[in-house]
Regions:
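Short His/Asp/Glu-rich catalytic/ion-coordination signatures at enzyme active sites or charged loops
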Residues: 54-55, 158
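Short glycine-enriched, charge-decorated loop/helix-capping segments at active-site entrances
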Residues: 56-62
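A broadly tuned preference for mixed-charge, low-complexity surface segments
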Residues: 13, 17, 62-65, 97-105
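Radical SAM enzyme core and accessory elements
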Residues: 79-175
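Conserved C-terminal portion of the radical SAM core fold
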Residues: 1-53, 65-92
Length: 175
């Protein structure tokens, strides 16, 4: 996962380094004992703070920031000794941003969802049919800001849309 609140560049670079260490271990096996070619696929998703977790107060990054983090991992992957055995995939940053709004949005987001649908957003979980510009236009049309829901740090005293739900764990526990 990329984009956690305490993440450092060293953390990002450690992902491809670990993949390379695994490939190195494979190549330590004598050729006659190996079972096929070594191919390691590493995939990352981007951090989305969720309700009822200690991260519910955390901010998300912008799509550009997430893609920058993926570029660091991808670039480091290409620098590894066993780069031909390594492959890297990452989740779509703009889909992540929308997922963040849906995860922590309030009742006003319902209007934006309906508006996006009426503007042509359909089957948006499929990458080839996802149109971020429809969603941003829908939010703007409803007078809402995606950044309000995602990129701002939330106060420990903020009242969340899900606070009325009793999960058996108090908000104070997460703080």
């Amino acid at each position: 996962m990329l984009g956690l609140p305490t993440e450092t560049e060293e953390d990002m670079r450690a992902i491809p380094e670990l993949a390379d260490q695994i490939a190195r271990r494979y190549y330590e096996i004598p050729k006659e004992q190996r079972n096929g070619k070594c191919q390691i696929t590493t995939s990352t998703s981007f951090f989305i703070p969720k309700p009822f977790t200690p991260f519910q107060w955390a901010r998300m990054y912008s799509p550009e920031d997430y893609l920058g983090r993926a570029r660091i991992v991808n670039h480091t992957m290409k620098q590894q000794h066993n780069q031909k055995s390594l492959k890297y995939n990452w989740h779509e940053a703009y889909v992540t941003v929308l997922e963040g709004v849906l995860a922590r949005g309030d009742r006003k987001v319902a209007d934006a969802i309906e508006t996006a649908y009426k503007m042509g957003a359909l089957y948006d979980a499929w990458g080839e049919t996802f149109h971020y510009e429809i969603w941003t236009a829908a939010f703007e049309k409803c007078g809402l800001s995606i950044d309000f829901y995602n990129t701002r740090e939330r106060s420990l005293d903020e009242v969340f849309p899900w606070d009325f739900i009793d999960t058996g764990v108090t908000k104070a526990f997460y703080k």
